[in-house]
Amino acid sequence: MLYFSDNELDDFLLEDIYRGDLTTHALGLESIPAEICFKRKNAGIVAGISIAEKLLRKLDIHPQVYVKEGEFVEAGSLLLSAKGSADKLHQAWKVVQLVLEWSCGVAQYTAEMISNAKAINPAAVVACTRKSIPNTRKLATNAVLAAGGHIHRQGLSETLLVFTNHRNLLSDPEDWQGIVTRLKQQAPENKITLEADNLVQFEQMLTADPDIIQLDKFTLEQVKQALHLLALANKNITLSVAGGVNKHNVAEYAKLGIQLFITSAPYYAAPEDIKVIIEKQV
């Protein structure tokens, strides 16, 4: 999984515990030997476990980890536990819980979307965009990968993807061949993706032979027409669908013959419920 630096882990912790735990201190519980455990309430995919472990170790807590990143577990499964002083465990509690809940939620949605797509087309690929909640992209990426998903692009420097907002600034916004030719010259090692807003644009793009045409917010009927036009043109161009694609409708697009699905839906999934219990050491 992804590497998280000490600074990133510190940021997670300091957001919540920059002045310690007032309640634990006021109750005089700080030095009491205690044990903490984290359980997944519902069956599903686990994500964020490696980050949770590192967060605990940052607080000099040495956890016992029972599952792996991306593993499917049954309801009520124990994910990790640790022993330590009550003040350390209470400082770790909420940060670790939130990382696990949010990561598991993203991973669960991703896994369900992949399953729905692959039930129709085993070659289907679910790729998540950079349209994540601000400051959560790395956590989200880690969760998507844990669930078996792919990353569409992490940032602007990774792929060549031409939007209408790029073309609006060109002297000839519809010179598709000129756009593709220039990109091949300037970035010869990268695949070229053009995004089509409608079928007219799509048909024009076919003549330029990009590697991929991304169909943005196309209805099922429009996708069907696009596939027909592609077949008539006899072009070896990959079609992807983006904009509004989610776990509820991905199978319908897959039935048409699409196998590359671009989505940000997993980032907005409901968090999974992680039960946390802190008790005195026996």
Swiss-Prot record:
Gene Ontology annotations of biological process type: NAD biosynthetic process; quinolinate catabolic process
Keyword terms, alphabetized: Glycosyltransferase, Transferase
InterPro entries, sorted: Aldolase_TIM, ModD, NadC/ModD, Nicotinate_pribotase-like_C, Quinolinate_PRibosylTase_N_sf, Quinolinate_PRibosylTrfase_C, Quinolinate_PRibosylTrfase_N
Keyword match Glycosyltransferase: yes
Annotated GO MF terms: nicotinate-nucleotide diphosphorylase (carboxylating) activity
Pfam families membership: QRPTase_C, QRPTase_N
Keyword Transferase belongs to the record: yes
Record's signal peptide: none
Domain of life where this protein originates: Bacteria
SUPFAM superfamilies assigned: Nicotinate/Quinolinate PRTase C-terminal domain-like (SSF51690), Nicotinate/Quinolinate PRTase N-terminal domain-like (SSF54675)
GO cellular component: cytoplasm
EC number: 2.4.2.-
Family the UniProt entry places it in: Belongs to the NadC/ModD family.
Record-given protein name: Putative pyrophosphorylase ModD
Organism per entry: Pasteurella multocida (strain Pm70)
Lineage: Bacteria, Pseudomonadati, Pseudomonadota, Gammaproteobacteria, Pasteurellales
